[in-house]
């Protein structure tokens, strides 16, 4: 509690000199209360990037990966490995976009988060499943359409990927070592649609694609907060940008001839100069 108050007091002390504040590297569950209180007490936008930046970019990736796979978000089964700030916020935004709570299974270090457990905080209770037939990641992932990993490296095996539904979506976002390597996932099955947090593989989920331009849109309109509608607008702006022809400067930066929307490119690159106008304008509206 003392450290939470210290962070809040320091942020409030500097707030009058800034138009917005981006919070970074505050662990769960403290981050939820710190952000909530600051949003209540300040009249400028406050956003915890580890939560909402990751959520927005991964949601844009999910929207597009589902299109490539020919699936609808309200129908897919989603397994989330990790229950920290990023995982919780990503999953909440997936729900805002149409994912159904009953189709989501979340796991923490103790296994499946179920309603039978008595050790859950408020954030975890929201995602607790009624299912009693699954306890481990290996059991939960069978037949799943989507895997979101925000946990630790090398916890997702090739056999687990093979047990997923056709054209599985695998977002292995642990850094620097993902839950499964790009090479191992592709070797397990060629139809996997994969994203990581790394720049040396296709479809990097990188917060820098979002937060600078989200704040630009909020500042341009003198918004007092970044609300759910603004986040969803950013999701769709980023997702739509990946479907447009890619500028030569982006192709050149990645030493490719012609990036185009599909399995290996469904998230815009961080160097794309169109992000500032597309995302900030969408947020401002």
Cite the ranges covered by each PLM segment:
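Short, small-residue-biased leader/transition segments that mark boundaries at the very start
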Residues: 1-7
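Short, ordered loop/turn segments at secondary-structure junctions
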Residues: 3, 25-28, 49-52, 109-111, ...
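Short acidic, glycine/serine/threonine-rich loops at helix termini
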Residues: 8-10, 31-37, 57-63, 89-99, ...
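Phosphate/diphosphate ligand-binding glycine-rich loop within oxidoreductases
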Residues: 10-53
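General beta-strand structural signal in soluble alpha/beta enzymes
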Residues: 22-25, 46-49, 80, 106, ...
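Glycine-rich phosphate/diphosphate-binding loop of Rossmann-like nucleotide-binding domains
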Residues: 48, 52, 56-152
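Adenosine-phosphate binding glycine-rich loop
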Residues: 49-50, 69, 172-284
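Long hydrophobic segments that form regular secondary structure
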Residues: 133-190, 222
């Amino acid at each position: 509690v003392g450290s939470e108050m210290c962070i809040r007091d320091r942020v409030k002390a500097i707030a009058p000199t800034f138009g917005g504040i981006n919070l970074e590297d505050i662990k769960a569950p403290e981050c939820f209360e710190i952000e909530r209180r600051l949003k209540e007490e300040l009249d400028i936008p406050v956003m915890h990037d580890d939560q909402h930046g990751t959520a927005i970019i991964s949601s844009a990736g999910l929207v597009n990966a589902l299109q490539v796979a020919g699936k609808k978000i309200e129908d897919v089964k989603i397994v989330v490995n990790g229950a920290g700030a990023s995982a919780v916020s990503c999953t909440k935004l997936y729900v805002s976009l149409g994912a159904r709570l009953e189709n989501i299974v979340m796991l923490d270090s103790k296994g499946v988060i179920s309603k039978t457990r008595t050790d859950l905080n408020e954030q975890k209770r929201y995602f607790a499943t009624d299912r009693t037939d699954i306890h481990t990641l290996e059991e939960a992932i069978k037949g799943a359409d989507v895997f979101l990993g925000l946990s630790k490296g090398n916890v997702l095996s090739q056999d687990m990927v093979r047990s997923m539904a056709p054209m599985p979506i695998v977002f292995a976002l642990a850094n620097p070592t993902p839950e499964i390597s790009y090479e191992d996932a592709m070797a397990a099955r060629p139809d996997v649609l994969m994203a990581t947090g790394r720049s040396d593989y296709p479809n990097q989920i990188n917060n820098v694609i979002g937060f600078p331009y989200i704040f630009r849109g909020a500042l341009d309109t003198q918004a007092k907060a970044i609300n759910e509608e603004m986040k969803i607008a950013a999701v769709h702006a980023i997702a739509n940008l990946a479907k447009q022809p890619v500028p030569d400067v982006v192709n050149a930066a990645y030493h490719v001839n012609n990036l185009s929307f599909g399995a290996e490119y469904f998230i815009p690159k961080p160097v794309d100069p169109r992000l500032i106008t597309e995302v900030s304008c969408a947020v401002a509206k």
